[in-house]
Curated annotation (Swiss-Prot):
UniProt keyword Phosphoprotein, yes or no: no
Protein localization: Cytoplasm
Enzyme class: hydrolase
Protein name per UniProt: Arginine deiminase
GO cellular component terms given for this protein: cytoplasm
InterPro entries the record matches: Arg_deiminase
Active-site positions on this chain: C399 (amidino-cysteine intermediate)
Lineage: Bacteria, Bacillati, Bacillota, Bacilli, Lactobacillales
One Gene Ontology MF term: arginine deiminase activity
Alphabetical GO biological process terms: arginine catabolic process to ornithine; arginine deiminase pathway
Source organism (scientific name): Streptococcus gordonii (strain Challis / ATCC 35105 / BCRC 15272 / CH1 / DL1 / V288)
Catalysed transformations (reactions): L-arginine + H2O = L-citrulline + NH4(+)
One Pfam family in the UniProt entry: ADI
Amino acid sequence: MSTHPIHVFSEIGKLKKVMLHRPGKELENLMPDYLERLLFDDIPFLEDAQKEHDNFAQALRNEGIEVLYLEKLAAESLTSPEIRDQFIEEYLDEANIRGRQTKVAIRELLQGIKDNQELVEKTMAGVQKAELPEIPEAAKGLTDLVESDYPFAIDPMPNLYFTRDPFATIGNAVSLNHMYADTRNRETLYGKYIFKYHPVYGGNVELVYNREEDTRIEGGDELVLSKDVLAVGISQRTDAASIEKLLVNIFKKNVGFKKVLAFEFANNRKFMHLDTVFTMVDYDKFTIHPEIQGNLRVFSVTYENEQLKIVEEKGDLAELLAENLGVEKVTLIPCGDGNAVAAAREQWNDGSNTLTIAPGVVVVYDRNTVTNKKLEEYGLRLIKIRGSELVRGRGGPRCMSMPFEREEI
């Protein structure tokens, strides 16, 4: 086994270590009037969401997988009072706080929290204006005087339980992402501190993308197909310019990959990431949402003479994948068994967003019965979890997990 703290050279190698985030009070700060602002369509019931998430984590442990938690790793990264204060200041600077005195009050609130994990969880939950002391009239600035009725001094981060997106593990390296929306881009701060200051992961992991970049990329669009081949999605959340930056860094830093397949597909919320429509479940099998296949474009990207070489592939997708993975044949298993109604319904409920924990062993939501039956017909072993509340955030088992270590295949 590798001595590197991050070791992910496939989507299907036996999963040894994975990072999750247990949903917290950030979900209780969702409001109907501001769902779109926070990239939600509905409000999960926190108590049941936590039960479902705990069952997900236990299902992974039952398979011998070590489960890490984002909130604990971030807390462990605040290794000195100076780093703790720096974290608070950086968090405040990125929180879009309106009002000078409001920022002072929030700083005092956060500095008064002595336990590091409690501090981290508070930054995730957001800050309601009602939690802060009333600002004296004489101390109010213009912003304080004209501020709207918006109830939050700092927005919550309700998408955090989708740990796949703020950063992505690629080989022994990490892509610390710049995300599509401001409300999610703040999530990458935790990854920054983990990979800079954590006793195990800090300073020991190569970054192949950095959150300070000005173009957007998210982990749901970054798939590690093999030790030689990556797949990336050009999607609603990830643009082509970011992919080019990422790939140049991967090739220049000799992270270990020889080719990238870039998938361009529909730019909309229901297909927000590549992994919502396409995931690898075995050496020679993938799930796919049939609706994307007609308009899908695939580009092969290599690195020659210090520059990217890009070729659009015109052939059959299954044949292209088989050729690049070195297998005789690839089977594309359609979400919803190809039925238009079932496919649309089950893709919306993340029927294509599977987490493979070993070749042919896949974690899925139990609700996607048509797709699950098809996967079982192809010989896959399914670990079914309930997700009636978790799915309201529009993400499945792959979205909710970030592998830190897999066995090689």
